Amino acid sequence: MSDLISALLLGILEGLTEFLPISSTGHLLIAEQWLGRRSDFFNIVIQAGAILAICLALRQRLWSLATGLGERANRDYVLKVGVAFLVTAVVGLIVRKAGWQLPETLQPVAWALLIGGVWMLVAEHFAGKLPERDVVTWKVAIAVGLAQVVAGVFPGTSRSASTIFIAMLLGLSKRSAAADFVFMVGIPTMFAASGYALLEMYKEGGFGTENWTDVAVAFVAATITGFVVVKWLLGYIKKHRFTVFAVYRMLLGAALLLWLPAAAG
């Protein structure tokens, strides 16, 4: 398979999985086993495509918040987004300075996918018993910030899965409201993570030797696919539960756990 096709597929995969509760990092680590490992710079660029996608998909909501800061409800919402982001940033930096690294094997990813699927089913079951609420509390904001760090530390967990369901269990029980808040928090989080990673790469001597055509194709693919996925998901969860994603995660995790010993042998 050519490097260009590989880059295209990885870009599409990033766009498909970044916002669905199935773990983009986990899927990219799995895909790299067959499509080849790419540089950190390449991975940052395709995540930038996902960032652009969500900004475009939520542009009306972002504009409404920006122009409506005179209203107390909007100021309160933006402040809680900021607090969730700051919690992620501070705790995430502590974890990073402690020497955390992505796993080099797929077994932790497989377990995270499997356990995360079970978590989704259990969490939605209990959240479904709560009265439907769409108000973001400070407790929810702080918990979402912490959940983002957990998702970053354990690839396969999924940022959207961990954050949406912790928000629902803590009182933001309306699925669409939980997803809206989580996606809003994700925008500064992904911007900051990508910027920090680029700065670290620059300090270490540059951005590698990636083919710029491959990078551009992957970026565009991630942007287009991510935009479509966000718009679709926000409509889907208004009428449906996350069950299909939970089942997919459990099947994929179980399949990986069965395949890994055979592949090693």
From Swiss-Prot:
The keyword Cell wall biogenesis/degradation applies. Its EC number is 3.6.1.27. GO terms for cellular component: plasma membrane. It catalyses: di-trans,octa-cis-undecaprenyl diphosphate + H2O = di-trans,octa-cis-undecaprenyl phosphate + phosphate + H(+). The chain crosses the membrane at residues 38-58, 75-95, 108-128, 135-155, 181-201, 215-235, 244-264. Pfam families: BacA. GO terms for biological process: cell wall organization; peptidoglycan biosynthetic process; regulation of cell shape; response to antibiotic. It comes from the Bacteria. It is found in: Cell inner membrane. GO terms for molecular function: undecaprenyl-diphosphatase activity. Keywords: Antibiotic resistance, Cell inner membrane, Cell membrane, Cell shape, Cell wall biogenesis/degradation, Hydrolase, Membrane, Peptidoglycan synthesis, Transmembrane, Transmembrane helix. InterPro entries: UppP. The keyword Lipid biosynthesis does not apply. It is a multi-pass membrane protein. Bacitracin is thought to be involved in the inhibition of peptidoglycan synthesis by sequestering undecaprenyl diphosphate, thereby reducing the pool of lipid carrier available. Belongs to the UppP family. PANTHER family: UNDECAPRENYL-DIPHOSPHATASE (PTHR30622:SF3). Catalyzes the dephosphorylation of undecaprenyl diphosphate (UPP). Confers resistance to bacitracin. This is Undecaprenyl-diphosphatase. It comes from Xanthomonas euvesicatoria pv. vesicatoria (strain 85-10) (Xanthomonas campestris pv. vesicatoria). The gene is uppP.
